[in-house]
């Protein structure tokens, strides 16, 4: 009977609260699969913003087997970005998200405020690199997400920014039972002025008593190759000053990492 009044198939026929304006604009306030279940002020405000302003539109590139928002693999971003039952997903926090396929043409990029390219596993074509280059030249926001050993196909895009991924993986002196490639990092002083959120993170990770750490199980270093006119602001730095870029060790659980400066580990 509900289908005669409203189509809730996209909501999985779950309980929702519908907000609707006179002009037909609609927004849903949902319940979530967590301990609190009910929406908080943040989720309600995000829903109301759909009536008051144009929401930031975030595109996730799905070409070349990149991490997708429509897939269900462990490596995909579908849960954190588009899951309607996850409170902190982008769609529940005031963002519009869209799957981006460059085969549809340049126009798909024109509608975006942010483009995320996350770990593609195949090379881009020359035409696609040109499309992404124009996107960067227009001053739009681009997020490149790579990790050790799988960043190769991001290199052409990094080159447009004058950057490159360093070979190897960041490690630090082993702490208790944790593997050496589990990097404990803190927010840099230069990053705290980016936004109020980064300022709060800086305070948490830099305080003298029991500082918190941002943990990354496997991270690659980034180096500047050339000046392409961008201002560079490092966001995170390793907490341990004895950390280095490891080029030899593969088994971080059963092996012990050792700095070998003779092969370029620094």
Task: Give the predicted meaning of each segment.
Residues 1-89:
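Hydrophobic targeting/anchoring helices
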């Amino acid at each position: 009977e509900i289908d005669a009044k409203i189509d809730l198939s996209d909501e999985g026929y779950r309980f929702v609260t519908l907000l609707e304006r006179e002009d037909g604009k609609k927004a849903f306030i949902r319940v979530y699969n967590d301990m609190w279940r009910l929406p908080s002020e943040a989720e309600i405000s995000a829903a109301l913003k759909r009536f008051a302003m144009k929401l930031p539109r975030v595109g996730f590139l799905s070409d070349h087997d990149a991490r997708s928002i429509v897939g269900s693999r462990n490596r995909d971003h579908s849960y954190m970005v588009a899951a309607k039952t996850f409170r902190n997903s982008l769609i529940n926090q005031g963002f519009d998200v869209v799957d981006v396929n460059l085969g549809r043409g340049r126009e798909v990029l024109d509608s975006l405020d942010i483009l995320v390219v996350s770990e593609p596993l195949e090379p881009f074509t020359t035409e696609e690199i040109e499309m992404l280059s124009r996107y960067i030249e227009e001053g739009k926001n681009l997020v490149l997400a790579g990790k050790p050993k799988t960043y190769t196909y991001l290199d052409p895009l990094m080159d447009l920014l004058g950057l490159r991924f360093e070979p190897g993986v960041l490690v630090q002196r082993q702490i208790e039972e944790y593997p050496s490639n589990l990097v404990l990092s803190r927010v840099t002083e230069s990053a705290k002025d980016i936004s109020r959120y980064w300022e709060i993170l800086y305070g948490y990770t830099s305080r003298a008593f029991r500082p918190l750490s941002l943990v990354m199980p496997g991270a690659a270093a980034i180096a500047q190759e050339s000046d392409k006119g961008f201002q560079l602001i490092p966001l995170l730095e390793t907490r341990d000053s004895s950390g280095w870029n490891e080029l030899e060790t593969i088994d971080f659980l059963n092996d012990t990492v050792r700095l070998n400066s003779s092969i370029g580990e620094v």
